[in-house]
Amino acid sequence: MALFITCRKEWLGSIWAKEKIGNLTNAASRRRIKYYFFYSTDELEMYRDVYESEPSCIVLLSNGGESERRLVSMFKELPMPLIVFGDHKYESISNEISYVMSDTADLTSRILDIFKKKGCKYPAVVGMVSTGQMDSLKIEQFKKMDYSGRGLVFDTESGKLSEAVEKLFKSSEPVDSIICSNDLQAICLIKIFDMVDPDWNKRLLLASYGNTTLVSQTSPSVTTGDFGFDSGSEQVIRIYRTLISGAGVSAMHTIMRHGFIERESTATQSPEGIVFSEKVTPKTETIKESVRRYKKAEKIEKILLGADAVDYRVIRGLMKGEKITDIADDAYCSPGTIKYRIKKYKETVGLAKTAEFSALLNELIDYKKIINH
């Protein structure tokens, strides 16, 4: 039994791909299913002996778009079932290809339900990429479901969050609740809102999609919808075992069991809202500097995704400025082991000095929240 996992190579660096791959390989390992990675038909050819000698399947990790359709057309002619481990609900579903999908419509609906119950009258979307497949779908869903009837969207065509933020600060429309594309965007917006109004979270509720590890440790922690990649991975395995069982099934289509986590970023009841055009607009460079937190946050999230108990002990120690020997004693490790881990962290985020890395941790993480790990 073997899975052959593929995706666009340029997508491998994203935290969403890392989470999907981690969940999928863990699910396969638990069932002693072998897995291989490939990125072209030539690379797959190297494993011909494997997929011709034992029941096998291709799993395409997808985030939508034209490139996905090209990959599907490339692989669906191969002598193996194809499962698309996607991110969203497909408009049309093939009877020849299996899909595991996220239902962003339900997540959007649940966010708006929470806003409505909290007494929010003026929801808006901020920062979504209008030209992106996933974000354009979320925007469309929001406009259909927005109970205020405004369908207020501050998006970006270029993919630059700063463009959307500048649109927001030009708006004379009141906003009392915001949905952004993902958690890391939310972390950037928190920084900008903090500069404009330290009490913004009493006037405005914030929610996003993704449920990253990092966003649960920020202040305030953002309310998020979890796409359910862990559930999706289990369903990929279930589909695979059904397809190879000889049950006469050519394809299966399932929806991931997502979750929703409400946090203090939606704790305020009946927020009064903010008219951003009445606020002092941060300078363009200030906005861009805040938005640069996205890349920093993404790199910290990569560390947290693979973190064990020792990693969390090291991170807490660095945030408090503890000596390496003290961290090592408390973690029951040698100082050399702790130094090696810190070296790997700095390589991940692209920093040379430990003090710089410690400062970054304190910038993004609330120490009071991370001590629970």
PLM feature spans:
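Linker/hinge segments immediately adjacent to helix-turn-helix/homeobox DNA-binding domains
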Residues: R238-G306, D366-H373
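Hydrophobic alpha-helical segments within soluble ligand-binding/sensing domains
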Residues: K89, S98-V126, K160-E166, A186, ...
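Alpha-helical recognition/docking segments in bacterial nutrient-uptake
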Residues: M1-D113, K170
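Helix-turn-helix DNA-binding segment
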Residues: K295-T337
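Basic, Lys/Arg-enriched C-terminal extension of HTH/homeodomain DNA-binding domains
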Residues: I342-H373
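An alpha-beta-alpha
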Residues: S109-G149, M252-A267
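Periplasmic-binding protein-like
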Residues: L3-C7, E54-N63, P81-I83, A124-M128, ...
